[in-house]
Amino acid sequence: MLRPDLLLHPTPKGLYCPPGDFYLDPVRGAVDRAVISHGHSDHARGGHGKVLAHPHTLSIMAARYGDSFAKQTQAVEYGEAIEINGVTVWLSPAGHILGSSQIVVEHKGLRMVFTGDYKRRWDPTCPQFEPVENTHVFISEATFGL
């Protein structure tokens, strides 16, 4: 099994996946490829080359930043697996806002989950948070963490 730090690790631009050559919710500057957890501005920014996200998140980003917020977009439904440079990525509901997603990254037998913002309490405005089974590493958003 791959060491977790070889699949995802923090950089000044955000959480980076070297084998897939993409960022999760990049925090500084534009990147060539981004996977976005949800449409709030602390996670979703314009100017990236390629953006992969849930269709509702892409719609929120377009409303906020204009239709040209990225050079290319790819909408992915919950549970739909996409391969990026040999790394499997799929989204699971995060229960935070419409389109909010946990980002699941799998490579060489390792499954890591990045939650983005999430909410476990039921909310009628979005699909409920779903735990991702058989997760090896769980990276939780902690807005008010210590």
Language model features by range: what are they?
Residues 2-30, 39-146:
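His/Asp/Glu-rich metal-coordinating catalytic cores
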Residues 36:
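Short beta-strand-to-coil loop within P-loop NTPase ATPase cores
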